[in-house]
From Swiss-Prot:
One of its GO terms (molecular function) is metal ion binding. Binds multiple chlorophylls and provides some of the ligands for the Ca-4Mn-5O cluster of the oxygen-evolving complex. It may also provide a ligand for a Cl- that is required for oxygen evolution. PSII binds additional chlorophylls, carotenoids and specific lipids. The gene is psbC. It is a multi-pass membrane protein. This is Photosystem II CP43 reaction center protein. The keyword Plastid applies. Belongs to the PsbB/PsbC family. PsbC subfamily. The modification N-acetylthreonine is found at residue 15. It comes from the Eukaryota. [CaMn4O5] cluster binds at residue 367. It is found in: Plastid, Chloroplast thylakoid membrane. The modification Phosphothreonine is found at residue 15. It comes from Cryptomeria japonica.
Amino acid sequence: MKTLYSLRRFYPVETLFNGTLTLAGRDQETTGFAWWAGNARLINLSGKLLGAHVAHAGLIVFWAGAMNLFEVAHFVPEKPMYEQGLILLPHLATLGWGVGPGGEIVDTFPYFVSGVLHLISSAVLGFGGIYHALIGPETLEESFPFFGYVWKDRNKMTTILGIHLILLGVGAFLLVFKALYFGGIYDTWAPGGGDVRKITNLTLNPSTIFGYLLKSPFGGEGWIVSVDNLEDLIGGHVWLGSICIFGGIWHILTKPFAWARRAFVWSGEAYLSYSLAALSVFGFIACCFVWFNNTAYPSEFYGPTGPEASQAQAFTFLVRDQRLGASVGSAQGPTGLGKYLMRSPTGEIIFGGETMRFWDLRAPWLEPLRGPNGLDLSKLKKDIQPWQERRSAEYMTHAPLGSLNSVGGVATEINAVNYVSPRSWLATSHFVLGFFFFVGHLWHAGRARAAAAGFEKGIDRDFEPVLSMTPLN
């Protein structure tokens, strides 16, 4: 029977330039992988693979700490965060650290502490990574059976899955505890333009929480991305954290059922492909969340969403022209529709002009001016507050668009500030990374399935011309 990890299938064309650079158990002859194949050389060396993973975690945490301190060093409190190219400080501010009413940054010391803590953590992880990569045991199965594993051991693999799920659940509950007990988090919907508050009235009703999953992803429905209040958001984390923890305990205590043993491929490369698929889904969801959602990603820190900037422009000019004597309720625009206000097909009063396509935007600076049937004309005439005018004028000139001409009616040139919105950065990067992770999933899933089926696509390595050529060195 052909073994799953036959080295034959791996022999690459390349030969090593310098044989002295190799380490036993990590060279081409013993693993079937050349040095540039990275961690693939460590598939069957659990101790060394542990070192690679811990070192990788150290690099990630080092980036977080160093970038955090870099952003703190460059931060100017007088300017909004989204004008300064920051992507880490907005996350810390959203968690309620260093923020006052209206999203004003009142204290940067918590951000400094965060950066230093991450740097110290990265040093610990870096040391652990180097230790396990160079000094620690090559395999863990003999000395530390709890941490050892064989890729084909289905029971052990689901136990490891369970441990990971419990850790994810604990992470979800960390946010819950911060929101409930440790100072609260920033709520962009707090009266008067946003503030930090403790969440006291969690939404735990399953029909509300799981109702988000049943929503359409299109239009005003918006699937889970449509969450617009912190009670639902934190309640969702309670549910998700509980499901992850109980699911983790389940996977630790049980063995995979027969249907699961048959359905999945049980190899290291298969697990890699499953993980890449999960990360891809996370990336796509994060992309949509940061682009469309101004509750989880408050506009005070990340800048306005596209629809928000467009509606802000309509509002800003309505305010200006109303002061100059325009009758905003009846003025006609160039197309014969309302210039400032019009009715949606279902009868709500909405902003007129190109921004009509964004009529279902909800934003904290606009909602107080709505009545039971859309925008309230009497409120628009009498109740507009200075903070709403300031905020909409600011958002109008900071659309998350990279265009030289008008898009969705937003002035993106001449009157606008030349900047790239963190929403643009974060949405684009997560979409691109999500896409590449999906391609990686397809690639590794295909290889894993082919190996499990006992065949490989490709040329027969025994008859390659390079094997008869003189080695380069």
